[in-house]
Amino acid sequence: MKHGRTLTELAIELDRQRKVKKDYLLDTRNVKMDAMENFFQITLINDEQRANTILRVNDIAHRQIGSTLGIPAKYYDKMRAENPDLLSTNVNSWFNETPSVRMVRTLDGTARAFLSERYRRIDNYEIAEAVLPIIAQIPDARVASCEVTEQRMYLKVVNPRLETEVSPGDVVQS
């Protein structure tokens, strides 16, 4: 069994994330990237509220920013590692020269995704809310492992009533 969280801990974390996450729809001309000492941050400029939101950029959002702007991943990564100011200059230039509306998904002060405005939001909380009641109705089902990471939610459930012998002496439960 893989170690992770208990089902209760997973539920607590998903509820916490649901409460603190925020999604922004912004014109890229209102997004500015800056290279800091050891990380990158983006500033979301919000003229209506006269307040800017400053966020660290995670690896997933970096990859999506590069893809959105048509910057090859290898070159993006090279600039990110070797010349951060050049990367910021390139990204900011392309944000202004090829404007589009993008969704910036955030969690805990981090830009965790940079997506199309048409992206359909399905959060881990919603998935758990739909799946867990069904699992609870399965007699003898047990959660073997569960975890939520920056990229995915994992939930492994074993139903001992569903089993088969894949080879002599090797029984697998589903």
Identify the meaning behind each predicted range.
Residues 1-130:
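Feature for intrinsically disordered/low-complexity regulatory segments and propeptides
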Residues 121-174:
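Intrinsic disorder/low-complexity polar-acidic segments
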